[in-house]
């Protein structure tokens, strides 16, 4: 091969700065290699050895070698020419660019880089430069990744360095790690439980994790020290954050909704294993086609099929049978006359039906949009193939123990309307197996397996496996699936239903055949056939429900009571006081009446008293006999053991029955040993008063005006409209409302007013209210006092002291006497009468002075001619204070001869005659002028009966 041929370029190739060589095309390599002789092959080996030589030689030595190679001539060129076909990867050189340029020039000079056209040389140089840059970039990336890995390893060692302890490694090698080695120390970060809104735990964990990443990016190297965030399904309403300090958590959670940062607690180190311990979740993994039930809204309890799950597994798209009314219940705005959709409540929701576009088009066309033949949008919701397609949150769905009924599965049939019978049978089988509940002691039979037909007793129960001790085997109990067991009952056993429509019903077993048990119900006296696994042995023959039992007396309304004749789980059959049988729900029953505290009694046809518990018999007709359950106003409830219909309960009028035996009479007829023992009788003390007899017939409180004394309506007035036992129905005056109040918490009034009385007082008075107190009405009656003068105000009825009527006598003092001389304080010349017959008026002074109230002369008294306190007065003859003022003759207590208490004044005309005698006067020096004297002057006393004293209040003659 010539030197020229060897120097010609074969293909695009070059040598990079770091020594990497790019190979030529494969076809040219084969052709060139075929021309290489043995001498050239040896040169290739020498070149390989030279390429692997030490790269740390000095530059001077390299230059000397280059000069020697130049002197060798063609031999050197051929050897370097062969290097064109070898891909030699050299180590990365860290020399400066000057050294790299020198090496390039040497390679060109030695023939490693062929000489071609100038364009080719430029292309080779540009390609080498690009390749060098790319390789340098790759090296930088690799270096940075190695640094990141080392940094991450360092962080892990710092955080979990405690796991590298010798004790932990030694324990791990043995296959057992003590729990104390797994507990964090006091130097590690603490876990805080932060309160949050229930149901938002998972959303908040994701939101906080995203916030953590954003803060780390924005803060650079100074990152927020939040180590972990998690939540547990078993601890609702809390999320857990691992951080070294409490302030870090407060800063981190600040501003995040649904988190209550102030309500947090530190989790003790001892409780961390329990907090992080994995537990079996009750949630079922949802897949397209799974059945779920909706927990809330108008579709609460409805079956739905999962169509699609969201990426975050928080929401899913469901296919639901819609409940639409197509705008029938919409409200119309009176202002705009536009329809407004009314929010449908759960109780008023329409029945489930597939979407009907024809009905929607006719009833509510404005809200209907057609997407395609099977896809419609109605009121912003999509309907495909008649089903509602809507997105629901998984937390509002029930995913476990979903057992669809045949009716529900029929709604989700195939496109042609057919129902998958296989799916239905499997669903029913699973539902029956899940409802089968076994208890220790139940006698069971094995249905499948090697022990098929064997019988035994249940010893232990679990969710799916039941431990059974087989009869006749002394071996330990064996475990069997729930589906392979069946309960065993014998005719005569008393059983009760555990679940289903007849839950709570009980009865006596009649027939057992093929796992089905037929028993007679204690409630309806009918035969019922129930699966054996849905029954359990019952010791109580009285069927009960959660709230009400058989033969309970319940209140349906304020005026209607009934007796329970069939008790279900939520539905009850009752017999009301009119004898009508009806079915009611638990919500329609107001309350249960406690018959043990009821004191209502009735009267039978013979006039005897009937109470609860007495035995009665009908006087006419079928002469049914039974025990009194409850006494109503005009009806009584009786239960008989000889009657099957209505659980033995019937209603009759108390007048159509007669008492056979009274429970109280039987108790009273028994011997009282306590009274026979004198020591016990002495300790008991004197006998107490007998209780008030219970009223019979119409209650005394009916139609009485009452005031309520209990809380809620305290102080309000009303009328008693009905009485039922101890409760009274009161119609309030303030508003048209009837309320039920204890009749002993009412105060009873007369309709005319007056003081109120209690119910016990009303019973003792036999319903008669005390009359209102009659007397002067100081509000409406005229204030003018009755007088004896014509035209005076009419007198009111008396009875009081002093009297107000001149027709009533015998008062003290006497009122209303006629006569001139015997004018009473209120009689004779009235206070408002004519001329003054007496002396100077109370208000009048000297003659000529006109009285305050007018008159003919100035001497006219303010209170009339015969002044109130004048000389014809009850108390004396002269004016109250004086006639002329010169002496005491006109004194209040004396002066005139007609004084009520004596002739001379108390203070004496000249000061001589005493009111009680003893002092001398100018008439009787011996002092016989006393009020009680016997002289003619003294006979004019108020107690005398002489003519001079006839004007006295107590005198007899005129």
Curated annotation (Swiss-Prot):
Keyword Lyase carried by entry: no
One Gene Ontology molecular-function label: RNA polymerase II complex binding
Sequence ranges of Polar residues compositional bias: 871-882, 927-940
Alphabetical keyword list: mRNA processing, Nucleus, Transcription
Predominant localisation class: nucleus
UniProt biased composition (Gly residues): 830-839
Residue ranges with Basic and acidic residues bias: 32-44
SMART domains: CTD, KOW, NGN
Disordered as annotated region, ranges: 1-131, 825-891, 911-958
GO biological process: intracellular mRNA localization; negative regulation of transcription elongation by RNA polymerase I; positive regulation of autophagy; positive regulation of transcription elongation by RNA polymerase I; positive regulation of transcription elongation by RNA polymerase II; regulation of rRNA processing; regulation of transcription-coupled nucleotide-excision repair; spliceosomal complex assembly
Subcellular location: Nucleus
Segments of skewed composition (Acidic residues): 54-71, 88-105
A single cellular component GO annotation: rDNA heterochromatin
Source species, domain of life: Eukaryota
Residue ranges, compositional bias (Low complexity): 851-870
SUPFAM superfamilies in the cross-refs: Translation proteins SH3-like domain
Family membership noted in the UniProt record: Belongs to the SPT5 family.
The protein's assembly and partners: Component of the SPT4-SPT5 complex. Interacts with RNA polymerase II.
Function description: The SPT4-SPT5 complex mediates both activation and inhibition of transcription elongation, and plays a role in pre-mRNA processing. This complex seems to be important for the stability of the RNA polymerase II elongation machinery on the chromatin template but not for the inherent ability of this machinery to translocate down the gene.
Name this polypeptide is given: Transcription elongation factor SPT5
Species annotation: Eremothecium gossypii (strain ATCC 10895 / CBS 109.51 / FGSC 9923 / NRRL Y-1056)
Gene name of the record: SPT5
């Amino acid at each position: 091969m010539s030197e020229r041929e060897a120097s010609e370029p074969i293909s695009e190739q070059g040598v990079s700065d770091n020594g990497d060589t790019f190979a030529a095309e494969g076809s040219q390599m084969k052709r060139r290699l075929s021309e290489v002789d043995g001498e050239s092959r040896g040169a290739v080996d020498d070149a390989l050895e030279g390429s692997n030589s030490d790269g740390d030689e000095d530059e001077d030595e390299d230059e000397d070698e280059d000069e020697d190679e130049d002197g060798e001539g063609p031999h050197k060129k051929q050897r370097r020419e062969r290097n064109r076909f070898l891909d030699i990867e050299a180590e990365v050189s860290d020399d400066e660019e000057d050294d790299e340029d020198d090496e390039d020039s040497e390679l060109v000079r030695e023939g490693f880089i062929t000489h071609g056209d100038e364009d080719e040389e430029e292309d080779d140089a540009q390609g080498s430069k690009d390749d060098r840059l790319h390789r340098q970039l790759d090296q930088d990336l690799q270096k940075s990744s190695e640094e990141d890995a080392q940094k991450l390893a360092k962080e892990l060692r710092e955080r979990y360095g405690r796991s590298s302890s010798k004790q932990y490694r030694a324990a791990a090698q043995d296959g057992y790690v003590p729990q104390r080695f797994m507990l964090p120390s006091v130097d590690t970060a603490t876990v805080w439980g932060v309160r949050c809104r229930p149901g938002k735990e998972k959303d908040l964990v994701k939101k906080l994790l995203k916030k953590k990443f954003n803060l780390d990016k924005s803060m650079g190297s100074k990152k927020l020290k939040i180590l972990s965030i998690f939540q547990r399904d078993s601890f609702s309403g809390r999320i857990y954050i691992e951080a070294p300090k409490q302030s870090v958590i407060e800063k981190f959670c600040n501003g995040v909704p649904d988190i209550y940062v102030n309500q947090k607690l530190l989790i003790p180190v001892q409780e961390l294993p329990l907090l992080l311990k994995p537990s079996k979740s009750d949630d079922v993994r949802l897949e397209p086609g799974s059945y779920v039930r909706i927990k809330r809204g108008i579709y609460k309890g409805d079956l739905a099929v999962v169509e699609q799950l969201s990426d975050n597994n928080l929401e899913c798209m469901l296919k639901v049978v819609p409940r639409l009314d197509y705008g029938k219940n919409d409200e119309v705005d009176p202002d705009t006359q536009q329809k407004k959709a009314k929010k449908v409540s759960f109780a008023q929701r329409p029945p489930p039906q597939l979407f009907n576009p024809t009905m929607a088009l006719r009833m509510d066309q404005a809200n209907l949009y057609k997407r395609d033949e099977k896809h419609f949008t109605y009121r912003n919701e999509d309907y495909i193939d008649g089903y509602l397609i809507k997105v629901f949150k998984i937390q509002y769905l029930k995913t476990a123990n979903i057992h669809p009924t045949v009716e529900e599965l029929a709604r989700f049939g195939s496109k042609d309307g057919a129902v998958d019978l296989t799916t239905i049978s499997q669903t029913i089988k699973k539902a029956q197996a899940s409802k089968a509940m076994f208890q220790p002691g139940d006698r069971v039979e094995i249905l499948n397996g090697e022990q098929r037909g064997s019988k035994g007793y249940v010893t232990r129960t679990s969710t799916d496996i039941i431990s059974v001790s087989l009869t006749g085997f002394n071996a330990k109990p064996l475990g069997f699936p729930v589906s392979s067991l069946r309960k065993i009952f014998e005719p005569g056993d008393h059983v009760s239903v555990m679940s289903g429509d007849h839950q709570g019903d009980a009865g006596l077993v009649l027939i057992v055949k093929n796992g089905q048990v037929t028993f007679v119900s204690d409630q309806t006296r009918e035969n019922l056939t129930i699966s054996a696994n849905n029954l359990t042995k019952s010791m109580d023959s009285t069927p009960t429900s959660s709230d009400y039992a058989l033969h309970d007396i319940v209140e349906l309304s304020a005026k209607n009571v009934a007796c329970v004749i069939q008790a279900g789980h939520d539905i009850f059959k009752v017999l009301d006081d009119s004898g009508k049988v009806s079915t009611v729900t638990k919500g329609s029953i107001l309350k249960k009446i406690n018959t043990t505290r009821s004191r209502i009694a009735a009267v039978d046809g013979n006039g005897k008293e009937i109470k609860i518990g007495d035995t009665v018999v009908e006087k006419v007709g079928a002469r049914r006999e039974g025990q009194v359950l409850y006494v109503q106003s005009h009806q009584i409830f009786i239960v008989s053991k000889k009657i099957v219909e209505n659980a033995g309960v019937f209603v009759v009028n108390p007048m159509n029955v007669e008492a056979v035996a009274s429970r109280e009479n039987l108790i009273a007829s028994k011997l009282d040993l306590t009274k026979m023992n004198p020591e016990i009788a002495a300790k008991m003390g004197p006998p107490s008063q007998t209780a008030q007899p219970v009223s019979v017939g119409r209650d005394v409180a009916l139609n009485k005006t009452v005031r309520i004394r209990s809380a809620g309506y305290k102080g309000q007035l009303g009328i008693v409209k009905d009485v039922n036992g101890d409760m009274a129905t009161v119609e309030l005056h303030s508003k048209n409302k009837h309320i039920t109040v204890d009749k002993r918490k009412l105060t009873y009034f007369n309709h005319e007013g007056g003081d109120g009385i209690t119910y016990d007082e009303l019973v003792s008075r036999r319903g008669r209210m005390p009359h209102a107190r009659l007397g002067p009405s100081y509000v409406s009656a005229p204030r003018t006092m009755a007088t004896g003068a014509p035209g005076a105000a009419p007198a009111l009825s008396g009875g009081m002291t002093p009297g107000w009527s001149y027709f009533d006598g015998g008062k003290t003092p006497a009122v209303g006497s006629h006569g001139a001389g015997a004018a009473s304080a209120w009689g004779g010349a009235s206070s408002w009468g004519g001329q003054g017959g007496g002396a100077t008026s109370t208000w009048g002074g000297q003659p000529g002075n006109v009285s305050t109230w007018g008159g003919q002369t100035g001497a006219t008294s303010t209170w009339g001619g015969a002044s109130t306190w004048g000389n014809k007065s009850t108390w004396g003859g002269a004016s109250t204070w004086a006639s002329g003022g010169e002496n005491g003759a006109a004194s209040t207590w004396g002066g005139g001869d007609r004084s009520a208490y004596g002739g001379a004044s108390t203070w004496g005309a000249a000061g001589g005659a005493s009111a009680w005698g003893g002092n001398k006067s100018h008439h009787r020096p011996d002092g016989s002028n006393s009020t009680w004297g016997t002289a003619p002057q003294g006979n004019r006393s108020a107690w005398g009966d002489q003519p001079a004293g006839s004007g006295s209040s107590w005198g007899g003659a005129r």
